[in-house]
Amino acid sequence: GVLGGAGLPDALDAALDAARALRGQGWELLPVMSFAAGQDTRFGRGTGWRQQLEGLTGHPVLDTLQAVEPLGPRRLADALVIAPCTGATLARLAEGLSDTPVTLAAKSLLRVGSPIVVAVSTNDGLGASGENIARLYQRKHYYFVPYGQDDPNTKPQSLKARFELLPQTLEAALEGRQLQPVLQCPCG
């Protein structure tokens, strides 16, 4: 499998925990980072996320368009897990854009019919990003980690995947089915 991601630290930490669970089940993971995930922010340094991913997976991070393009055609991965998947990445996927390592990895794997597992983490999931989520549901080979509102009282538009369900979602996606129920009670 391939693990790609971009997002805020709480979601990145949850994604790393899910990746550890996948590794514990024997999955080999190839890490892919978006350009944005490699940036330093007030939440942490991009090099820190890179080092954690490389240490966890035992592989260098794929962070260029050239590095991810052959993933599908050369059958280097069975699936792509985008964890976390931000509103910006949802928009790019919905528009069919392949201008980041994560979105080009998705295009590369879709070319050969491989599943794309999306772990949503966005503050506007019930706002502007809601339309993009709906568009991806209508396409073949996209599967969602079950999700819910992560803080309905303070951030009523915000959605976050139940990252602990990522391994089961990946297994279901490889069988061609969506893990249900996809809409969950609020995630805390």
Listing of model-derived features with the role each one plays in the protein:
Residues G1-I116, S121-G188:
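A cross-family phosphate/adenosyl-ligand binding-site feature
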